[in-house]
């Protein structure tokens, strides 16, 4: 089974939560966006959150559940 990947990234002044190339939420802070992504990822295991920094590089990765790739 593949991991479901949720992305957290900045866009202008907002922070976006994305999954399957769809914006799920636009939030005022990184903290809020990570919380929303974490809730969705916990409910959609196995999953991961990739948090992008201002340059677009992955700054942090969080995983939820166990999958065949572990």
Please state what every model-predicted region is:
Residues 27-45:
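A short, charged, amphipathic alpha-helix used as a generic interaction element across diverse proteins
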Residues 16, 25, 50, 62, ...:
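Intrinsically disordered, low-complexity regions of eukaryotic proteins
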Residues 4, 57-70:
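A cross-kingdom feature marking charged/low-complexity
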Residues 46-53:
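A short amphipathic beta-strand at an alpha->beta junction
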Residues 10-11, 22, 53, 67-70:
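Eukaryotic scaffold repeat domains enriched in small/polar residues
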Residues 1-23:
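Short aromatic-glycine-(Arg/Gly/Cys) micro-motifs in beta-strand/loop hairpins
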Residues 20-22, 29, 63:
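Surface loops and adjacent helix of pleckstrin homology
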Residues 24-27, 57-59:
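Surface-exposed loop/edge segments in extracytoplasmic proteins
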